[in-house]
């Protein structure tokens, strides 16, 4: 693997004490035939999309001696246009913000609202990068726990808000690594509690921001609402999105934030100047010219997810049917009772199939690939489960 171990850092370097012994975050990047571990869209952009991107980048190359538009106004307008089309929610340019992937969006939110003495609250199990953002911004990371079916435990979450007084409440819909959707009634209850909640170390009248990470929202079932619909109703709501997943644009690193202007202005305080390159902006704008093509495989991936979930429920391990978490994403958390998921991971890898060991013990996650890749996954998993059964 290509990740560099922090344990190899020379002792004479003044690395922060809290970073000593830490490892760089990242899923394995291995050269194997079937990569189903990082929730990418497996289908490459269509030739027409590639041609437009290449042309726009060629045009912008003539101006690379100049800094880009640091407010990326044209791209923010493109975000507005896309969200109105995709979700039916009309927002203004000053309610959108872009960054280098939703990872940078989330980091900017932690920079703006976290910090020493501040607390951020998540709901376990959740995305494993959130505590990394907290660590890097000296924010204390606290957890409420989800229900056994991985749905949001609203009562436990509201009690945690009252007890720990967070500056940020981070929810994920669909949740990663489980795929569980967030019910709008549950979100409204959390937003309502946050509107009057105190923030530890802050002045009276300051209330927490609720961040909903919707990185995988385009994979939701038709008719499922999005948190974007509540932005006009709740001033304390911020919704993070990305072009990396359904939009098949992971390599370009483009994420964006939708919120009321006050939240956007807070994020603008901590952003680096000219953080989105001219090339990134040009490529993203070109991709939006081909929205239909970029999203053309989403319905098929949704069908693949549903078919794979049904198939997994028919499989057994040690005489027990596999558990499959409810999902509205492009990945599935499955297993529930694997005694040694690392063994299963290794055996699958030997057969050229790479998935993830994430989430609670006993569970594994697989993202949806092409039809050929999913056939390889099913064939390999059946063989591996048979081997494990014989142990």
For the regions a protein language model found, what residue spans apply to each?
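N-terminal small-domain helix-loop-helix segment of the aminotransferase-like
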Residues: 8-101, 108
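Conserved PLP-anchoring active-site segment centered on the Schiff-base-forming lysine
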Residues: 112-133
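Conserved PLP-binding catalytic core of the aspartate aminotransferase-like
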Residues: 302, 315-351, 368
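PLP-dependent enzyme catalytic core of the Aspartate aminotransferase-like
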Residues: 185, 346-351, 356-391
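PLP-dependent aminotransferase class I/II
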Residues: 46, 236-317, 323-324
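Active-site pre-lysine segment of PLP-dependent enzymes
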Residues: 152-164, 177-246
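Short Gly/Ser/Thr- and Asp/Glu-enriched loop/turn motifs at secondary-structure junctions
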Residues: 31, 92-93, 325-331, 359-363
